Design a protein with these regions (language model features):
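Interfacial "cap-and-anchor" motif at the non-cytosolic start of specific transmembrane alpha-helices
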Residues: 1-34
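PAS/GAF-family sensory domains
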Residues: 29-32, 36, 54, 76, ...
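Amphipathic HAMP/coiled-coil signal-transducing linker helices
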Residues: 31-49, 63
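Conserved long alpha-helical elements within nucleotide-processing catalytic cores of c-di-GMP signaling
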Residues: 47-73, 80-110, 116-125, 131-141, ...
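Short, well-ordered beta-strand segments
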Residues: 75, 124, 165-167
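Cyclic nucleotide signaling catalytic output domains
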Residues: 115, 142, 156, 163-172, ...
Length: 196
């Protein structure tokens, strides 16, 4: 009887230890999964949302805009001559420039807006609170102003410029997030061709 009691207590202790290990494993897996999801949706250099997450934000903004007078504006921003900066001054300087551009863009937009790094030297800003194309242009000018001040490089101050394309969601066109981003990208290339 005592032997049976000891075995029962041992079995209970073993079961509790196994359950505790399972709970710890589940928590670890949840944390790992959260990390994987976060890494899949953000840019590792800047911590900004990436293209996938930005497209989700744009799609939500488009869907929400049908109920209000506010329309999403997408700005496609390309850092001018970034390849030559990267090639001549090195990748660490290029990374520092991209990080500073990300910081300045984040500071230049309203709290309701979102900035993402979608590739190399390309950024996208979404502002879902604009009520006219004129407000979109004002936002683009504010962003250009934020980038005008020199940035620190490993040879002194560097002046960085950018080309910006703007796309404003017109309700009657029923554009998708991908369409809106593509229109902004096309407008950016036109701006770049026109002389930065």
């Amino acid at each position: 009887s005592t032997d049976r009691g000891v075995r029962t207590v041992s079995a209970i202790v073993l079961a509790a230890a196994v359950m505790l290990r399972v709970i710890q494993s589940v928590r670890l897996n949840a944390t790992t999964q959260d990390t994987l999801v976060r890494n899949a949706l953000t840019d590792s250099l800047t911590g900004l949302p990436n293209r996938i997450l930005m497209l989700e934000h744009i799609e939500k903004a488009i869907q929400s805009s049908w109920k209000t007078t506010q329309r999403p504006t997408v700005l496609f921003i390309d850092v001018d001559r970034f390849k030559s900066i990267n090639d001549s001054l090195g990748h660490s300087t290029g990374d520092a420039i991209l990080t500073e551009v990300a910081r300045r863009l984040s500071n230049a937009i309203s709290p309701q807006a979102t900035v993402a790094r979608i590739a190399g030297d390309e950024f996208v800003v979404l502002d879902s609170t604009t009520e006219s194309p004129t407000q979109s242009v004002v936002l683009a000018e504010r962003i250009l102003d934020a980038l005008r001040d020199p940035m620190k490089g490993n040879g002194g101050d560097m002046f960085v410029t950018a080309s910006i394309g703007v796309a404003y969601a017109v309700p009657t066109l029923r554009l998708s997030a991908e369409d809106l981003m593509q229109h902004a990208d096309t407008a950016m290339y036109r701006a770049k061709s026109a002389g930065r």
